[in-house]
Amino acid sequence: MKRLFIYAAIAAAAIGSMTSCSDFLEVEPVGKMSEPDFLNQEGVSRLITGMYATLHNDSYFEGTLTNYAYGDVMGGSANKGSNFTDQPDFTSLETYTFAADNSYLSVKWKSCYNGVFFANNLINVAKQVETELTAVPGQSKDYFTETIAQARFFRAFWHFEVVKLFGAAVPYVNDEDVAANVNP
């Protein structure tokens, strides 16, 4: 009987100790920002900065605003040079023999719709905190209207970049339809 009591006490202690560390395991990562972090004026300002950051791209040929690959090379102002095995996707742009899986076109498409996504995301977040943005202390202008106007400009700008390259038959993505039409 004494042995049965000891085994039962050990089993109860083992089961009780297994449930004690759940709070320790559910700690939020320090460097991670969640959606509530953006639902204020400072968060909206961070989203505006992120939207402007979509203008900069480290790649000279693909998603950049210079449109070197699509304007100069395809227009005949620049030649790719070298031989046909050097950057075959670039050669196909120069000779107008490209396919839908051309890496330069794919990256340009994705970078443009990434800019559209940032603008639409900013519009959705700004609408959630409209009352806070409308009356910003120390500012005479309406911060909400200015934010929405900047986001709509960027959305139009990125759509125009897509239309310049792919023609008028490209999907228009507004702030209600954020996640669709990201891939060509």
Q: Each predicted region: which residue ranges?
A:
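Bacterial Sec-dependent N-terminal signal peptides
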Residues: 1-30
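Proline-centered turn/helix-capping motifs that create local helix->coil transitions or kinks
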Residues: 23, 163-171
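Short linear capping/connector segments at secondary-structure termini
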Residues: 30-33, 135-140, 173-181
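Membrane-proximal, proline-rich intrinsically disordered regions
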Residues: 21-71, 97-98
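Conserved, well-structured interaction surfaces
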Residues: 45, 85-166, 182-183
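Active-site substrate-recognition loop segments, prototypically the cytochrome P450 B′-helix/B-C loop
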Residues: 75-79
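Terminal processing/anchoring signals of secreted or surface-associated proteins
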Residues: 1, 21-23, 51, 119, ...
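Short, hydrophobic secondary-structure boundary micro-motifs
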Residues: 28, 63-64, 132, 171-175
